[in-house]
Amino acid sequence: MAKSLRSKWKRKMRAEKRKKNAPKELERLKSILRTGADVVMEEVKEVATVLPAKEALEKQDDCKMDVDNKRNKKTLLDQHGQYPIWMNSRQRKKLKAQRLKGKKKSKLPKGLAW
């Protein structure tokens, strides 16, 4: 989609507004950190445990999520014969046709049984 003049103008004005307000915002953040840094940290410690970075990295382990249902990679069926919820009916029908095509065997031609 092409960029309209209006959207270009709005983007330009937002950038100028950010430039104008940046010093005020920086001062506001610095004042918050100067006055109440200890108070803020005390509130955070009450709510959650604060760990140093090294301990947090050591504590992190590579655990994988346990998945209860096992799916066949080729047919995408789970152990109960159900397709995934995101699959639409056309895809299900196509996979089912492929699966049944392999199962069919040629029948012996009917003839006179003597």
Curated annotation (Swiss-Prot):
GO terms for biological process: dendrite extension; positive regulation of dendritic spine development. Residues 1-21, 91-108 have a biased composition (Basic residues). It is found in: Nucleus, Nucleolus; Chromosome. GO terms for cellular component: chromosome; nucleolus. One of its GO terms (molecular function) is basal RNA polymerase II transcription machinery binding. The keyword Metal-binding does not apply. Residues 1-23, 91-114 are annotated as: Disordered. Keywords: Chromosome, Nucleus. The keyword Nucleus applies. Belongs to the learning-associated protein family. Regulates dendritic and spine growth and synaptic transmission. This is Protein LLP homolog. It comes from Gallus gallus. The lineage of its organism: Eukaryota, Metazoa, Chordata, Craniata, Vertebrata.
